[in-house]
Amino acid sequence: MAAGEGDVGMEVETKAPAMPPPPPASSSAARKKKQARAKNGDTPEPDAAGGARARASRRAKRGPGSYRGVRQRRWGKWVSEIREPNRGKRHWLGTFGSAVDAALAYDKAAASILGPRAVLNFPAFSPPAAAIAAPEQCEPPFCSPATTAAATAPEQRQTPGCSPAAVAGSGGGAVFEERDVKPVVLPLPLPAILQDGGGTEAMAQHWDWEWDASWPELEMFECLDDIAMYLDVDAVMTTRDCKVEELDADIVDSPLWTLSD
């Protein structure tokens, strides 16, 4: 009997311990969600009442002199800035000596950006949004109503022949068309001395030339004799249909015209 009791005791001692029951599925899912939030650095979203209490507590911590969009530097100055609601862009408004001045700057910027939807620090002292958005107009002194109307009215001038009816082509065709235009060549008027029948001597007297004198500048015309040696005047006059009319005989009988002889 003693041996049998010992065998039973050994069997009881070698039996595996019982496992604890698994936790419910809802508690495990909540725990995993909480761990994921802690890993990402997110905080649980409070309800409306909790959010209002949190904002009130933060406002109480900042003190009675704290305003929206205003914070104090360590050396005592106050700075003001504003963020755009949708874009998140921050606009720097400046540094001020007091918190009230910084708050007023924030109110002005918020009213210009958000309009009537802006939440202001001093709603009773803020200017209307229309006055902020509209630019200041400085009227010049001593301006009569007629002068002001003439200056503000746009100047409308219509060039003759540039009306819409003149610009639009008939039948909807093109206004500007390409056309062959021949150049107009006007004959040059002859000097009055040649028109009166005067010759080279008359021209010399008119221009105060000393024709018989030995004028050094007249030597420049000697190069015409060398040039005339290489010109075929008959061929040029035949191709160009040139006619020498109403010229004095002394001019026509120059070395340039007698090369073919």
Swiss-Prot record:
Region entry Disordered, spans: 1-72
Keyword presence, Oxidoreductase: no
One MF term in the entry's GO annotations: transcription cis-regulatory region binding
Keywords tagged on the record: Activator, DNA-binding, Nucleus, Stress response, Transcription, Transcription regulation
PROSITE patterns referenced in this protein's UniProt entry, alphabetically: AP2_ERF (PS51032)
DNA-binding region of this protein: 66-123
Chief location bin: nucleus
GO BP terms, alphabetized: positive regulation of DNA-templated transcription; response to stress
Family membership noted in the UniProt record: Belongs to the AP2/ERF transcription factor family. ERF subfamily.
Biological role: Probable transcriptional activator that binds to the DNA sequence 5'-[AG]CCGAC-3' of the cis-acting dehydration-responsive element (DRE).
Protein name per the record: Dehydration-responsive element-binding protein 2D
Lineage summary: Eukaryota, Viridiplantae, Streptophyta, Embryophyta, Tracheophyta
